[in-house]
Amino acid sequence: MINVYFSDNSCKQFLPGIKGSDIITHLFPELLNKAIAIKINDKSLDLSTEITEDCKFEVITLDSDEGLDIIRHDTAHIMAQAIKEMFPEVKTVVGPTIKDGFYYDFSTDHIFSSNELEKIEEKMREIIKKNESFIREVWTREEAIRFFSNKGEDYKVKIIAKIPIHENITVYKQGSFIDLCRGPHAPSTKISKAFKLTKVSGSYWEGNTNNAQLQRIYGTAWRTEEELKLYLNNLIEVEKRDHRKIGKELELFHIQNEALGQIFWHEKGLIIYRIIENYIRKKLENNGYIEVKTPYLLSKTLWEQSGHWDKFREHMFLSEIDNKVVAIKPMNCPCHVQIFNSKIRSYKDLPLRMAEFGTCHRYESSGALHGLMRVRSFTQDDAHIFCTEDQIIEEALKFCNLLMEVYEVFGFKDILVKFSDRPEKRAGSDKIWDKAEEALKASVKAANLNYVLNPGDGAFYGPKLEFTLKDAIGREWQCGTLQMDFVLPERLGAYYTGSDGKKHHPIMLHRAILGTIERFIGILIEHHSGKLPIWLAPVQLSILTITEDAIDYAISLKHKAMKQNIRAEVDITNEKINYKIRSHISKKIPVLWIIGKKEIETESVSIRYLESKDQHIMSSDKALKTLLSCASI
């Protein structure tokens, strides 16, 4: 008999060879219609898996995240089968699951078009309707290579060659289709009913642009048609909010091939950038930070000393000057340690909070670049706090409170915190790890934030907090970080003289609130759908004239507003007023003042707000006072 242990710590005995599905039938009949796979000793396996030794047993159900991932994995296989039946000459490559869906890469001379996706979906539904079983088989390496070679599936042969010798080669069959796969899969194709193929794009074998180009078909799959419909509607909303589209429409920025991964900020976009930068600068100043500026180009020797050369070299932009290798900095932290080291420090100088709006450069493949969200050149709202062990708790608390104040101002109130504690391999003593971890927990608790534990995911040099924002349509964006560092100050020879007269290495807290200004602006644009708060809008007020007689009055109002630091513009064109209103609404201008004969006579303005179709008249002085009350923070 074998002992099978369950999540409630109970244990049952069974004959060796019992299938996972049989255990569910005997002990969990209420899960029969929900079970999609099982876990044996934390490894996900098919329901049909035979259990031959003592183990821990769990059921994976359709309503779990893992269950949904299996549905998507199944659907990727079904799509590959459909395409092989429709286009026999196509070679299959890989088909993993991703966030909200899946994709499959194919090698073929046939160019897939978006118009073909519906036909592929129809073929997939035929396969699903047949309720074909997913059958797992274990093959020898020789059998697998021979089979896929005979089928002309060159990429599968390449994948097999990279599988370690000691690992089994497993394949899955459904109908006439056989694919190299570790699994697990559902019992049959019938579960994958709610799906949609979403787009076609190019890709490269192993993600390397020097390799053969492939075609990638993306899809999404869900448990029910209702979930699918909700997701697809959300996709439409995401497309409407795309910061690249809005950024172009509002003339905020652009990107071009001659400077991939770098932003051309236009006048209005730079206004937003500077408002954010100056707001953060003022908050830092009020919270005891000093601001510094460090070089962009630094010698290879500094990156070797810091440890970044070994771990980060492939992401650096390198050059050679005077026969010496230099790198454009990918991060600011080693530079800040140099400033710390520039003079003798005492414990009385700590904590030292050092901030920089540091422009950094990191290599990202062209395929990974995405508007403002993923770039090669970016500016961090970076700061490093040099402190003693005894100051960690207070500094972490202050940072959490500052971060929450900033997020609320920008319209984010739903914040998820992830706490990553000590990994197995780490630097520093258990005592300092205990103190650091307790400090982070205490800071989150004091800020009235709940956290999710990310066990063992801290860096080898210290634990960390990650702060994730939830936007208006429920998407999550990781922005803020607080990272303890016990190692870099020691590597770079940073020390202070303690009250005992001895030298001590400071603790270094790496921290950021926005992450990068570029990405944060992209998030803001999508969160607000381009309709930024009045204080952040590049143009806060547009004054529109109905007749030529109103031009002088409109211009005088503009000057009056600008003297009060209102960002105002005036439209004195000959267009009809309704056209002007539509035009300025499309530019997301938060406040419109409309000026006609009546307004001139009464020294008033007719006000229309971006989110309202109503107009109301107010004296120009009162209208300006009202605008001033919300035009800055």
Swiss-Prot record:
Keywords: Aminoacyl-tRNA synthetase, ATP-binding, Cytoplasm, Ligase, Metal-binding, Nucleotide-binding, Protein biosynthesis, RNA-binding, tRNA-binding, Zinc
Cofactor(s) demanded: Zn(2+)
GO cellular component terms listed in the entry, alphabetical order: cytoplasm
Cofactor binding annotation: Binds 1 zinc ion per subunit.
Subcellular location: Cytoplasm
Gene3D superfamilies xrefs: 3.10.20.30, 3.30.54.20, Anticodon-binding domain, Bira Bifunctional Protein, Domain 2, Threonyl-trna Synthetase, Chain A, domain 2
EC number: 6.1.1.3
Stretch list, region Catalytic: 242-533
Binding site for Zn(2+): C333, H384, H510
Sample GO molecular function, one term: metal ion binding
A Pfam family of this chain: tRNA_SAD
Swiss-Prot/TrEMBL catalytic activity: tRNA(Thr) + L-threonine + ATP = L-threonyl-tRNA(Thr) + AMP + diphosphate + H(+)
GO biological process: threonyl-tRNA aminoacylation
Record-linked InterPro entries: aa-tRNA-synt_IIb, aa-tRNA-synth_II, aa-tRNA-synth_II/BPL/LPL, Anticodon-bd, Anticodon-bd_dom_sf, Beta-grasp_dom_sf, TGS, TGS-like
Primary site of residence: cytoplasm
Residues of the TGS domain: 1-61
Keyword RNA-binding in record: yes
Matching PANTHER family: THREONINE--TRNA LIGASE, CHLOROPLASTIC_MITOCHONDRIAL 2, THREONINE-TRNA LIGASE
NCBIfam families, alphabetized: thrS (TIGR00418)
UniProt function note: Catalyzes the attachment of threonine to tRNA(Thr) in a two-step reaction: L-threonine is first activated by ATP to form Thr-AMP and then transferred to the acceptor end of tRNA(Thr). Also edits incorrectly charged L-seryl-tRNA(Thr).
Family named by the database record: Belongs to the class-II aminoacyl-tRNA synthetase family.
Subunit relationships: Homodimer.
Name by which UniProt lists this protein: Threonine--tRNA ligase
Protein's organism: Ehrlichia ruminantium (strain Welgevonden)
Higher taxonomy: Bacteria, Pseudomonadati, Pseudomonadota, Alphaproteobacteria, Rickettsiales
Gene: thrS
